[in-house]
């Protein structure tokens, strides 16, 4: 059995769709994102056994030059046979070629197989996140609350202490966990994902599938915190209504009871499984197999 890896080609579409259907029971989104993935920096990789596609994975270069490892899928007939390792080797060949200082991925807190594969290549557990969601139809947009203006990175930087405490150093959009930094906030500003004023910050956006969900982070400063968070949530509800997003999704540190309680009071529902972000960084990497 010969395992090889190469860049995705348009003629691989049907095979990759079958790989996704076999590898995961739900949340099939390859068809929606393949064109987007091919337009972003970083390779969409196909793994083949004896020339036949049986796995795939995407490496994406983010705003700060780090890489995000996503869409790792292996057909069940070929799992635990070295296909995932081959995709990771391809990832790290590209990481070295691009000179990227860090690589990250996420998995479910109980997904030992995914975490174990990442650990073989030097990724280490970095942070854990709890998520909650609410259908847009359950949101209420109040007309008596003043909307938030769009802001730039400079204004958002004032909220760094609160964001670090709330997010563990990462901002989540479409289950992509961006390292919290000035460079990342400038990238978010360029995407139009930042809203706020001197007391309230809302980060809201979607990398892809904007009709599926709008991903948000909320932060506040000073007194009347619940009032400020309510203003941010109201603005997010309006954005979701305008974009046609089916739901709002929020990720935060599992120990942040303030955000958790606020979301519960406003109709959000807990997701059953927390997410774990894993990271490889140049200065701490032990193996690049």
Place the predicted regions along the sequence by residue.
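Active-site rim helix/loop that mediates acceptor-substrate recognition in acyltransferases
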Residues: 13, 20-58, 165-194
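Conserved beta-strand in the GNAT
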Residues: 46, 52-60, 68, 73, ...
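Conserved catalytic-core motifs of GNAT/GCN5-like acyltransferases
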Residues: 61, 104-107, 124-138, 269-281
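A conserved beta-turn-beta hairpin within the catalytic core of GNAT-like acetyltransferases
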Residues: 61-69, 79, 206-218, 270-274
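Conserved acetyl-CoA-binding loop-helix of GNAT-fold acetyltransferases
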Residues: 74, 80-94, 116, 120, ...
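Conserved active-site alpha-helix within GNAT-family acetyltransferase domains
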Residues: 85, 109-127, 254-271
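Conserved GNAT acetyl-CoA-binding A-motif
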Residues: 94-110, 242-253
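Amide-forming acyltransferase catalytic core, primarily the GNAT-like/NAT-type
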Residues: 121-211
């Amino acid at each position: 059995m010969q395992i090889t890896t190469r860049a995705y080609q348009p003629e691989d579409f049907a095979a990759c769709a079958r790989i996704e259907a076999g590898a995961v029971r739900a949340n099939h989104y390859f068809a929606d994102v393949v064109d987007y993935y091919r337009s972003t920096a970083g390779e969409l990789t196909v793994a083949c056994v004896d020339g036949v596609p049986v796995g795939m994975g995407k490496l994406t270069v983010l705003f700060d030059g780090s890489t995000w490892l996503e869409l790792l899928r292996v057909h069940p007939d070929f799992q635990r046979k070295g296909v995932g390792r081959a995709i990771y080797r391809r990832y790290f060949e590209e990481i070295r070629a691009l000179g990227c200082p860090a690589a990250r991925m996420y998995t479910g807190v109980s997904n030992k197989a995914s975490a174990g594969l990442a650990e073989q290549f030097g990724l280490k557990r970095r942070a854990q996140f709890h998520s909650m969601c609410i259908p847009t139809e359950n949101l209420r947009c109040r007309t008596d609350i003043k909307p938030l203006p769009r802001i730039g990175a400079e204004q958002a930087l004032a909220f760094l202490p609160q964001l670090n405490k709330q997010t563990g150093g990462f901002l989540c959009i479409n289950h992509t966990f961006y390292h919290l930094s000035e460079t990342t906030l400038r990238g978010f500003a360029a995407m139009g994902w930042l809203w706020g004023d001197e007391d309230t910050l809302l980060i809201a956006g979607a990398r892809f599938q904007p009709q599926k969900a709008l991903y948000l982070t909320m932060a506040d400063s000073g007194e009347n915190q619940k009032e400020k968070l309510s203003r941010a949530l109201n603005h997010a509800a309006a954005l979701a209504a305008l974009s046609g997003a089916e739901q709002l999704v929020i990720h935060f540190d599992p120990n942040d009871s303030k955000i958790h309680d606020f979301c519960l009071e406003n109709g959000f529902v807990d997701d059953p499984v927390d997410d774990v972000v894993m990271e490889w960084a140049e200065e701490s990497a032990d193996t690049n197999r």
